[in-house]
Every structure is written in structure tokens, then in C-alpha cells.
UniProtKB/Swiss-Prot annotation:
InterPro entries: FMRFamid-related_peptide-like (IPR002544), FMRFamide-related_np (IPR051041). Keywords: Amidation, Cleavage on pair of basic residues, Neuropeptide, Repeat, Secreted, Signal. Residues 122-158, 282-310 are annotated as: Disordered. This is FMRFamide-related neuropeptides. Residues 26-65, 86-94, 103-168, 184-194, 203-205, 214-216, 225-236, 245-254, 263-265, 274-277, 286-293, 302-312, 321-331 form a propeptide. One of its GO terms (biological process) is neuropeptide signaling pathway. Excitatory neurotransmitters that directly modulate chromatophore function by activating chromatophore expansion at the chromatophore neuromuscular junction. One of its GO terms (cellular component) is extracellular region.
Length: 331
């Protein structure tokens, strides 16, 4: 038979002692339960008192420090993280913390709930409940000077409108449905110098996006033009233009833009400085039937002097031509 080592003997002795103490405690507890009915062992009263006191103390400690992470002392002004219910009987205040759970009902919460119920009943029954009595003096009706009062109201309204009109810059408004970025012109009559904005609404020049200082420069417009049809410069609607345009320079007014609308030169994209037919793409009918420049894409310099060299130069044409390939026959 193998000999026992000292460690194994020590383990056996410890197990035996624990088992003996456990059995004795179990027997004592069973005897105490029987003594409650028969009152045979007065020592059990002391055991039960100590047990109840320990349970109460552990419960209080568990309610005070239950499911939270605290940094420092849990007094008024300290910060901690708590996970659980709040206890109203604690000697410290629970503030500046992150809590997950329902708190115990407080007096303020009850007052808020009662006020919400009163407001809901007031809305349902359409009754007026006066919460406070104001200590201010009752307003006096000045029936002596009604005209003076009306005049002051009108003056105030005009003043507010003027201030709003002067401060209409660098803002986004969705009442009049536009977004404007830039400075407002100092002259109120000059409506064409409003620059760098996008407007969508009921405006004389409506539904467009403009970027620049001039009237017809670097903007995209979509919609009807309110001016008369007789004005040729105002007929440019539904187009996108990029460049410097002016009323005096006709060549500069129609350069580097894409236009879509009812225009003699309509539905085309042009890139160049001159009003001649150069460096552009046009799609549509030309009002002059004898002119050969329709439905084509041309890239090159155009001029009026050298007709042969400029008529059929670096372009792609799709359509019928009035002059059928004069350059090819002459070449």
C-alpha cells in the first residue's frame, strides 16, 4: 500500500474538520428551528438576532453601493456612474452621474405628473385654469390718442422691414425659399447686382442660381423671364452661362454658355469669345434655311473673310446643308 504524503494528510484533515463543523452547524440550526416551537434553547434567540442584524446591514450596504462605479466619495458634488435604482433615504445626493434604470418617485416628479394631468384635462375640457396671479399693474387702455398709437405701430413695422432688407446677406431662408451668399447691394433699386446666391421662389428673376456681380454672368437660370419679349437681351431663359456678359458688348453677352429655350440660336452649347460660329455644339433648327450651320459640332477659329477655309474646318455635322460641300468641290 502506498504511503500518504504530508500534503495529502493535511488536505484530509482540513476536509474532515470542515465537514464536522458543517454537520454541527446543520444540527444546531435544525435544533434552533425546533426550539422556536418548543422554546427549549434560549441561545437560538441570540443567533437569530445576530443573523437578522447582519442581513439588514448587508441589505443597506447593497442598496447604497449596488451596481455602480464610483470615483471618489459619494457625497454631494462627487461624480460617479450608477447602474440601478435610486434610494431616497441615502445621506448623500445623487447628481452628476450616468444612471441606467428608473429612479424612486420624488416630490418633484409627483408635482410634474399632477401638472401634466391638469393640463391634459384642461385641453380636453377646454377650461382655463389660472396657476399664478400676476402682481403687475393692469394695462391701461389709452383711448384718448388712438391715432398716435396706430402711427407708432406703423413706424415700428416700417423700421423693422428696413432693417431686415438691409441685413439680407449671407443667409439661408426657407420662407421665401432661397439661399443667398454675398453682400446686399447698397442701392435698393438696383436688383440686378445681387450676386452669389441661389433663389427659389416668387421673384422677378426666379428659379435660378447666380454666381457673379453682373446681370448675365456666370449663372444658371430656369424659368420664365418677366420682361417683354421685345427685349432681346431678356429673352435668354432656361440657360446656363459662364463668362462676362453685358448689355453693351453683344459678342461678350453670348459666350461660354449653354442655352436651352426659344431663341434664334437655341439648344446649343458654345465656348468662345465671339458671336461667330466657332468652338460650339448646336442642336436644333436654324431660322435661316440657307445657312449650313445646324446640328453640328465645330472646333476651330471662325471668320468672315476666308469662307473656304473656315466653312468645313474641324467639325462634325449632322443634317442637311444648303450649300452642299462647296469646300470639297473647290478643293
Amino acid at each position: 500500500m502506498r504511503c500518504w504524503s504530508p500534503c495529502s494528510l493535511l488536505v484530509v484533515i482540513v476536509i474532515y474538520c470542515l465537514s464536522s463543523h458543517t454537520s454541527e452547524a446543520f444540527d444546531l440550526a435544525q435544533a434552533c428551528v425546533e426550539s422556536q416551537r418548543l422554546s427549549l434553547l434560549p441561545i437560538c434567540d441570540t443567533i437569530f438576532a445576530v443573523q437578522q442584524e447582519g442581513a439588514q446591514q448587508s441589505a443597506d450596504d447593497g442598496m447604497r453601493s449596488k451596481r455602480f462605479i464610483r470615483f471618489g466619495r459619494a457625497l454631494s458634488g462627487d461624480a460617479f456612474l450608477r447602474f440601478g435604482k435610486n434610494v431616497p433615504d441615502l445621506p448623500f445626493e445623487d447628481k452628476r452621474f450616468l444612471r441606467f434604470g428608473r429612479a424612486a418617485p420624488q416630490l418633484d416628479d409627483l408635482l410634474k405628473q399632477a401638472l401634466q394631468r391638469v393640463e391634459s384635462l384642461q385641453k380636453a375640457d377646454e377650461t382655463s385654469v389660472r396657476r399664478k396671479r400676476s402682481t403687475d399693474a393692469a394695462p391701461q387702455n389709452n383711448a384718448e390718442n388712438p391715432e398716435q398709437k396706430n402711427d407708432s405701430a406703423k413706424i415700428t413695422k416700417r423700421y423693422i422691414d428696413d432693417v431686415e432688407d438691409s441685413d439680407v446677406k449671407r443667409f439661408m431662408r426657407f420662407g421665401k425659399r432661397f439661399m443667398r451668399f454675398g453682400r446686399n447691394p447698397s442701392d435698393a433699386g438696383n436688383k440686378l447686382t445681387e450676386k452669389r446666391f441661389m433663389r427659389f421662389g416668387r421673384d422677378p428673376e426666379k428659379r435660378f442660381m447666380r454666381f457673379g456681380k453682373s446681370d448675365d454672368k456666370r449663372f444658371m437660370r430656369f424659368g420664365r423671364n418677366p420682361s417683354d419679349v421685345e427685349d432681346e437681351l431678356e429673352e435668354d431663359k432656361r440657360f446656363m452661362r459662364f463668362g462676362r456678359g453685358g448689355e453693351d458688348d453683344e459678342e461678350e453677352a453670348e459666350k461660354r454658355f449653354m442655352r436651352f429655350g426659344r431663341d434664334p440660336e437655341k439648344k446649343f452649347m458654345r465656348f468662345g469669345k465671339s458671336g461667330e460660329d466657332k468652338r460650339f455644339m448646336r442642336f436644333g433648327r436654324n431660322p435661316d434655311e440657307q445657312e449650313a450651320d445646324k446640328r453640328f459640332m465645330r472646333f476651330g477659329r471662325g471668320g468672315e473673310d476666308d469662307e473656304v477655309s473656315t466653312e468645313d474646318k474641324r467639325f462634325m455635322r449632322f443634317g442637311r446643308s444648303a450649300d452642299k460641300c462647296k469646300g470639297c468641290l473647290e478643293g
